[in-house]
């Protein structure tokens, strides 16, 4: 069973993601903001997958910054990003180097498939 940190400011999307990930047999920790996510990352227990929205309502901080903080603690953390924004070529490079991308809107089967294949920063496939 994997431990998954979900970071999403849209409550209905967060509830959907929690439901899908829990249905896959994984435990979830949920944060509706960067502040909540950073507080959860202070817990000594490590997470196996970070699923985070890129754009969060905390000004200059968002999913990339949450992932950066999380990877300071766990450099091999698997990261899955999501956004409803248009993805630029520059952003695509970031995903290749640091995680996978699941664009919004996504379906429950798409989330299930993506959460089972998000690579770590070292390119190792997870064994959830």
Segments from the language model and where they lie:
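As written
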Residues: 92-102
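C-terminal output helix
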Residues: 106-118, 123-128
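Conserved acidic carboxylate
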Residues: 8, 83
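Conserved phosphotransfer microenvironments
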Residues: 53-68
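Acidic, metal-coordinating helix/loop segments flanking the phosphotransfer/catalytic sites
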Residues: 30-49, 57
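Conserved phosphotransfer cores of two-component systems
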Residues: 42-45, 69-77, 94
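Negatively charged, flexible loop motifs adjacent to catalytic sites
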Residues: 84-89
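Two-component/phosphorelay signaling modules centered on CheY-like receiver
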Residues: 11-29
């Amino acid at each position: 069973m994997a431990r998954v940190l979900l970071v999403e400011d849209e409550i209905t999307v967060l509830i959907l993601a929690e439901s899908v990930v829990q249905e896959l047999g994984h435990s979830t920790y949920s944060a509706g903001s960067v502040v909540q996510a950073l507080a959860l990352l202070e817990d000594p227990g490590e997470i196996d997958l970070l699923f985070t929205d890129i754009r969060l309502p905390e000004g200059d901080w968002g999913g990339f910054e949450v992932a950066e903080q999380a990877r300071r603690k766990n450099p091999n953390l698997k990261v899955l990003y999501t956004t409803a924004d248009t993805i630029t070529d520059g952003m695509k490079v970031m995903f290749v180097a640091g995680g996978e991308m699941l664009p919004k809107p996504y379906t429950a089967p798409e989330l299930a498939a993506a959460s089972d294949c998000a690579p770590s920063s070292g390119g190792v496939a997870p064994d959830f």
